């Protein structure tokens, strides 16, 4: 269906989603601290489990996925299905539109 893959979304809406759903555990800026989850700066084009100085699960390190718009689109729908064994305690964003908005924001904010 139309929600099957990434399409550019609304960055401002994505920023709000990040603040309410992600910012408790993640920072995005260069040099930002790791919190419960890793800092996300430089996320796009990086493999899973590679943010310097963060203690990942083996599942995350071994997933061998490269983060881009489409892998994030799948992952954020159901993180534990995409990477079984991840410690990210987030149920996912079921609406494709919300994932598009969030990923559009992440592309800008983590670059």
From Swiss-Prot:
Keyword Protein biosynthesis on entry: no
GO terms for molecular function, please? electron transfer activity; heme binding; metal ion binding
Q: Kindly provide the PTM information from the record.
A: Binds 1 heme c group covalently per subunit.
- Protein keywords: Electron transport, Heme, Iron, Metal-binding, Methylation, Mitochondrion, Respiratory chain, Transport
The intrachain disulfides are: none
The protein's job, in short, is:
Electron carrier protein. The oxidized form of the cytochrome c heme group can accept an electron from the heme group of the cytochrome c1 subunit of cytochrome reductase. Cytochrome c then transfers this electron to the cytochrome oxidase complex, the final protein carrier in the mitochondrial electron-transport chain.
Q: Indicate what this protein is called per its UniProt record.
A: Cytochrome c
Organism whose genome encodes this protein: Aspergillus niger
Gene name of the encoded protein: cycA
């Amino acid at each position: 269906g139309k929600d099957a893959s990434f399409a550019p979304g609304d960055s401002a809406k994505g920023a709000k989603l990040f603040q309410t759903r992600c910012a408790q555990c993640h920072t995005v800026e260069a040099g930002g601290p790791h919190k419960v989850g890793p800092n996300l700066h430089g996320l796009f084009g990086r493999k899973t489990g590679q943010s310097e100085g963060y203690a990942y699960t083996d599942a995350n390190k071994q997933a061998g996925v490269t983060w881009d718009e489409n892998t994030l689109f799948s992952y954020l729908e159901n993180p534990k299905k995409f990477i079984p064994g991840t410690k990210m305690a987030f149920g996912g964003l079921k609406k494709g539109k919300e994932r598009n908005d969030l990923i559009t924001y992440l592309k800008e904010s983590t670059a």
